[in-house]
Amino acid sequence: MRKIVAIAAFVSACLVAPWAAAAPLQLFPSPVYVTLQGSDSVASLPGGARWNNLDSAHYVAVSPDGRQLLVSSASTENVFIVDAKTGKTLATIAVGAVPQGVEIGPHGWFGLAVSAGTDSVTVIDMRALKPVKKIIVGKTPHNAHFAADGQLAYVTLQGGTGAAVLDMRSLAKTGEIAVPGIHGPHNLDLSADGRVLWVRDLTGSVAAVDLRTRKELALIPVAPGHAGIDVIPGGRYVFTGGIAGHVVDVIDPATFKVVKQVDVGQGPHGVRASRDGRWLYVAVTATNKIAVIDTHSLKVVKQFDTHGKLPFWVAVRGNN
């Protein structure tokens, strides 16, 4: 009887969704992971596996070697470390009230988990599967992003006016970068050369900041509401959604202008490109779909039904 129960539990925790059969392999050069916040699960493409029992799966990051996922919970104070192959939860770590963004460093050693309710970021040893330090970063942090060499990390301060800078050698906050003109610094990314910080806000603006001079280079109006932001590999475009609208904005980083708006359906939030920069995956929250945009033609080439509720964030191996 115990064996039957164990098998049933495994099956319920790791299901293959019907969207797998409809996922052309050429659209997915590397694995893509999507949080289904309303279904307590993370789904993967192109294989179609879905891993359940992840309470209100909110943000997700994948390790550089593709072996681990770091997933935050919108309804508890926890983050989960998950085996990216089997879906097994390897560790559940308490990080404080209102967990938000998560990120794994370029070497795979450290993970970062943001707690908006405690104004902190928890540093996690991804090999030992344990927290190693909690860093107070500023008012209402939201998400984090590592520099390419892993020595620095940046954390948006949604309750402030910019981003905190963390030294990942000393595991300490070393300063803040002002981002004037935006309301609630929300999500972030770095340019391909690491010189420009891109910040998406809560209400419909994107700012670009020169990290050497700390000067704001541009303030760009985009779709309403909050969303993710992605400088695609190669740096040709910057994409951002807008959860209160229905389009993804395409920004030319050379001119800081929106060159196109791509209609994907109501509520686009998470955006992340394939590791080769050819495809953009968009979590469309109100339609429960994943839209795939061709970054050459800037057109939607496929819409996948997630067979889950509230697809929120997207992680792609090779594009952290």
Map each language-model feature to its residues:
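Bacterial N-terminal signal peptides that target proteins for export
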Residues: 1-8
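Predominantly soluble domains enriched in secretory-pathway, periplasmic, or organellar proteins
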Residues: 10, 14, 18-320
